[in-house]
Amino acid sequence: MRSPVSLPRRAALCQLAAVSLLASLHAGCATAAMPPLLDLQLVERDSGSVLAQYASAGRRYSPGSPGARYAIRLSNRTGERVLVVLSVDGVNAITGDTAGFGQTGYVLGPWETTDIAGWRKSDERIAAFEFTSLGDSYAARTGRPANVGVVGAAVFRE
């Protein structure tokens, strides 16, 4: 039985659930014998600290402090290019559309690591990722609260 978690506390926990499943996709099929294509970490932007991850029931969780800004560190763990379709709170990090597999993503070169600090507003501007309450989240304010707290990454070989 799950212990109850207050709404603000739950909103402050970023779920990395999709990553543990989707990052293990290899050429369209998941296999337990192959290592994941992608490593994903949350990085607190002010301190540069990588947030701890805790696994439970096939998902990974990282506790965050309300109001803290964070970046998502994507590391390609292969010797080939991969496409990462990234979403935060169910919103595509590049387009701002409700997240889906066939959307625009980030192409990472072999062994490349990059930090994504927010939703892309233009080529020069972003809206920073920030731990906040459900009601203050961008997704909830735009009528899409179902996936608040979820960081998702669909990873595809080129």
Region roles according to the model:
Residues C29-E158:
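Intrinsically disordered, low-complexity segments enriched in small/polar residues
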Residues R9-C14:
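N-terminal export leaders
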Residues Q15-H26:
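Bacterial N-terminal signal peptides
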